[in-house]
């Protein structure tokens, strides 16, 4: 069992982060924030997918102006993403955001960062210190020669110490780079020296399978080491995919369970059914199920039930038929044309019982 790193607990709106709270899944909208309707529609989709905190970009004044309505109508806490324009941090807090994300390296003078922190303290707004390889302080680049893991960690520790000195503790830190091992090492260095909650992810991971794999490896390593209080899978894709991927990573490590986890055999010469087609149909029809269930779809009856005995329910497919099984025991033989519908009926019954029977 994974032993999670002990961190202090903070709050972003009504969401607890760190301490004994579960790891929180975040994402970021890809809409123009000033397009309130599009932004709220995407926030709704993210929320329905399981997102618990959402970040929005505020590069322009019109984006800041849109925040009040977005915050008011959002079903989850909203974080304003601030870069290069410290005035937008103050304005965003006036509009009621629950948190702000700043990169001190591109904000400017230390006095300005402190003023932002003092305002956040006054308003009860959480702050995320964002450190990444693309905007490291000049003196650290000169010291290390490049954005090394040590340089990134030192930057994060430097600003963390300043926040503590200023009497502000409702903050978390993110240390991100596009290199997986550098990212892991930087977070490990920071985690060994402080109890500040960490937001983890791999920046600029890319799109499709490559982006998902890169993020899964980087995030998975840190989570296995007990590091990470909030997580975002950064992909060049629909942000809903980020949320879905984050939950798959957490489910794989036994850290969160939400919705259906489908397991299926890799196929071999024994299968008598178009298994990829069946799995895809099952995935699509179960996408709206919120009850944590493990569903197995196996391509033959030889070892299927034994191999999938840890599943809550599943199908072991044969030629023209399938065995429907629950908790490792066959309960019904069904025709191939009816097997998916029979599986769905049984899952609906399990949902009514809370997934236990």
From Swiss-Prot:
Changing residue 132 to D: Loss of activity. Converts 2C-methyl-D-erythritol 2,4-cyclodiphosphate (ME-2,4cPP) into 1-hydroxy-2-methyl-2-(E)-butenyl 4-diphosphate. Pathway: Isoprenoid biosynthesis; isopentenyl diphosphate biosynthesis via DXP pathway; isopentenyl diphosphate from 1-deoxy-D-xylulose 5-phosphate: step 5/6. GO terms for molecular function: 4 iron, 4 sulfur cluster binding; 4-hydroxy-3-methylbut-2-en-1-yl diphosphate synthase activity (ferredoxin); 4-hydroxy-3-methylbut-2-enyl-diphosphate synthase activity (flavodoxin); iron ion binding. Changing residue 256 to K: Reduces activity 2-fold. [4Fe-4S] cluster binds at residues 265, 268, 300, 307. The keyword Iron applies. It comes from Aquifex aeolicus (strain VF5). InterPro entries: Dihydropteroate_synth-like_sf, Enolase-like_C_sf, IspG_bac, IspG_bac-typ, NO2/SO3_Rdtase_4Fe4S_sf. SUPFAM superfamilies: Enolase C-terminal domain-like, Nitrite and sulphite reductase 4Fe-4S domain-like. Belongs to the IspG family. Changing residue 26 to E: Reduces activity 100-fold. This is 4-hydroxy-3-methylbut-2-en-1-yl diphosphate synthase (flavodoxin). Changing residue 307 to D: Reduces activity 500-fold. Its EC number is 1.17.7.3. Changing residue 307 to Q: Reduces activity 4-fold. NCBIfam families: ispG_gcpE (TIGR00612), PRK00366.1 (NF001540). Its cofactor is [4Fe-4S] cluster. Binds 1 [4Fe-4S] cluster per subunit. Gene3D superfamilies: Dihydropteroate synthase-like, Sulfite Reductase Hemoprotein, domain 1. Keywords: 4Fe-4S, Iron, Iron-sulfur, Isoprene biosynthesis, Metal-binding, Oxidoreductase. Changing residue 81 to N: Loss of activity. It catalyses: (2E)-4-hydroxy-3-methylbut-2-enyl diphosphate + oxidized [flavodoxin] + H2O + 2 H(+) = 2-C-methyl-D-erythritol 2,4-cyclic diphosphate + reduced [flavodoxin]. The gene is ispG.
